[in-house]
Amino acid sequence: MKNEINAVLENMTTATPEPEDYTGEDGLLYCGKCRKPKEAYFAPDKAAIFGRDRHPAECDCQRAAREEREAAEKRRRHLDTVEELKRRGFTDPTMRDWTFENDNGRNPQAGIARRYVEHWEDMRADNIGCLFWGGVGTGKSYLAGCIANALMEKEIPVHMTNFALILNDLAASFENRNEYISRLCRYPLLILDDFGMERGTEYGLEQVFNVIASRYRSGKPLIVTTNLTLDDLRNPEDTAHSRIYDRLLSMCVPVRFTGENFRQETAQRKMESMKKLITD
């Protein structure tokens, strides 16, 4: 034990010289590159305790190297955290590519999505969600994914899923139904994609209501994308849909998506590329 203590003291109190280092007029070891001391004298009372008169000190070179190592380690931990958030947060790996950086810049609602991320803390504090509604292929899901990716890059947990998957999970899971829904509601932001496309059975509608009502009670924001019109949501066909839509509209600010169908455009571009390849 005594030898171990001595080894610790030795490491604590002895600076390791490099070939270019030198001893200054004050008797301390100096860095041969930055010309700053690598040692400092103990106060007299500390010197008596350690039995030495000096201890290592960081020169500018050592400090810069340490800060670089710490920054690299911080970046690594950040990347690991973001990777884990995206692994848990996305139900489809392609959603990882739905980012503002990959956006074609032609969707006028992109600015709203960007500002939602920029003002996330306010949105979270005031429990402000969004209802992205509009025609098929107008970029609703993509921009919701952009929000998810941007927040997860800030190490904020987000879960993006749809009710078809939720209903399948509830039917297949051994987990308690209430615990499953509670887990969904623990995410700071929940994104429900393609709302209204799930099967309209009595059981399905009841679970849809349970999820949305639980999210409402959690006081946390919700983003929903749907092909339903605002008129559909405000004038539901029956009571079962009415209580779902009413709760949804109380939580989310409607944002209309109009314009070109980006999916059709992508399909047309792929068709033209294929024609070119097979006719060349």
Where do the language-model regions lie?
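N-terminal pre-Walker A segment at the start of P-loop NTPase domains
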Residues: 98-123
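Short glycine-rich substrate-engagement loop in P-loop NTPases that contacts/grips substrate
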Residues: 108-117, 148-189, 199-206
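Walker B catalytic acidic pair
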Residues: 194-195
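Walker A/P-loop nucleotide-binding motif
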Residues: 124-144
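Residue-level preference for the first positions of well-ordered beta-strands
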Residues: 127-131, 158, 189, 221
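A short, basic N-terminal segment
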Residues: 1-104, 265-280
